[in-house]
Amino acid sequence: MLFLPADTGHPTGVAAASGPHVRSPVARAVRAMEPRCPPPCGCCERLVLNVAGLRFETRARTLGRFPDTLLGDPVRRSRFYDGARREYFFDRHRPSFDAVLYYYQSGGRLRRPAHVPLDVFLEEVSFYGLGAAALARLREDEGCAVPPERPLPRRAFARQLWLLFEFPESSQAARVLAVVSVLVILVSIVVFCLETLPDFRDDRDDPGLAPVAAATGPFLARLNGSSPMPGAPPRQPFNDPFFVVETLCICWFSFELLVRLVACPSKAVFFKNVMNLIDFVAILPYFVALGTELARQRGVGQPAMSLAILRVIRLVRVFRIFKLSRHSKGLQILGQTLRASMRELGLLIFFLFIGVVLFSSAVYFAEVDRVDTHFTSIPESFWWAVVTMTTVGYGDMAPVTVGGKIVGSLCAIAGVLTISLPVPVIVSNFSYFYHRETEGEEAGMYSHVDTQPCGTLEGKANGGLVDSEVPELLPPLWPPAGKHMVTEV
């Protein structure tokens, strides 16, 4: 019979007509599908599996249900046969083998024992070669991210460029380029903010501010090309220091985007990537603004239309901050959390919309008799309802009647309850993605397929294996640092 550890949670043993696993419907269905053969038969032979001193016993036909695995293939498992003891010996993790054997007995149900760490169990599953499908199901059940396959270009030069600009962890030069890219992004954002200061702002694009400039000080006298200081030459747009810095940043962004576009393995996949679209949007405002400025200097186009375009384009420049998400795991986790919580966020907005309509209507009718009321209509009350339900409370609009104050109190309480309902789900999603990312980093997992070759094996004469007997195991789960590769396309 089979010797089991006392704390095991999986039914294991001989595939006979007794035992707890036979009473389960799954086990009976699996046994009903097995072919009946008269004894003596090799498939009914009992096999003894010794795992680090703990002996398991099962039938050969039980292991034969999965012939592509290490235990299911008689040729591959024969390498571990001990003729003197008439058993198969595996110097592996004993608590994990209980679940591995149950995988064969149950017809493909793989469950990690509660007392076995995930990384240890994944390594055992890889050793016994249970297959990529079983490993993917296990990762999904455990909440692990399935590493996607990241293709590489075929040409060697394009492959080096792609690794240099797309994978900062691939080499020291790639890390330096990533640092330079982050610094350029930060400089661009700082310039975008500083050029809106009154001391640096050039308002000559807006003729409507000319009277204000004459009355408020010299810094607004830049309008229509006039000098901010008496006697100083008119300020030209292309001589502006902010324009020069912005041009240098755009040159770097354009160079980076162009190199990645040329070296990418698939143009279609490249343009479907959201981060690449953000990179394109980050440089588009500069060229539109430059073309508008040149057209205005040549007298082409309407000034009002040019001014409207410039204002919209300048607003789009703020999206450059999302370029940092390419180099920030925290921003990526935040994006994954928001994407996974779209349903909860939609419910939150829907609940707030209902509350805003109800309480704005109630406070309007409660304050309608007041002559000096701020709640002149229900749409005017929307703003008050929003800031009250979100517990902001600016105080620019406040009820003064008893009924209005009661409505305001109920609105604040309802807002707290409404906002607090979906928050635990969003926090749970963030915790899930955060721990998944940190656990992947601690385990040394990479987001691409490893192709590290196997070590040199000794010959059969020394008790080893020849190359043809190497088991077709899954790729290593935790490749050594500096040895990660990706699949070529």
Swiss-Prot record:
Its main location: membrane. It comes from the Eukaryota. Keywords: Glycoprotein, Ion channel, Ion transport, Lipoprotein, Membrane, Palmitate, Potassium, Potassium channel, Potassium transport, Transmembrane, Transmembrane helix, Transport, Voltage-gated channel. GO terms for molecular function: voltage-gated potassium channel activity. InterPro entries: BTB/POZ_dom, Ion_trans_dom, K_chnl_volt-dep_Kv, K_chnl_volt-dep_Kv1, KCNA7_BTB_POZ, SKP1/BTB/POZ_sf, T1-type_BTB, VG_K_chnl. The chain crosses the membrane at residues 176-196, 242-262, 274-294, 309-328, 345-365, 406-426. One of its GO terms (cellular component) is voltage-gated potassium channel complex. GO terms for biological process: protein homooligomerization. A lipid is attached at residue 264 (S-palmitoyl cysteine). It is found in: Membrane. A motif (Selectivity filter) lies at residues 391-396. Pfam families: BTB_2, Ion_trans. It catalyses: K(+)(in) = K(+)(out). Glycans are attached at residue 224. Heterotetramer of potassium channel proteins. Mediates the voltage-dependent potassium ion permeability of excitable membranes. Assuming opened or closed conformations in response to the voltage difference across the membrane, the protein forms a potassium-selective channel through which potassium ions may pass in accordance with their electrochemical gradient. Channels formed by isoform 1 inactivate faster than channels formed by isoform 2. The N-terminus may be important in determining the rate of inactivation of the channel while the tail may play a role in modulation of channel activity and/or targeting of the channel to specific subcellular compartments. The segment S4 is probably the voltage-sensor and is characterized by a series of positively charged amino acids at every third position. Belongs to the potassium channel family. A (Shaker) (TC 1.A.1.2) subfamily. Kv1.7/KCNA7 sub-subfamily. This is Potassium voltage-gated channel subfamily A member 7.
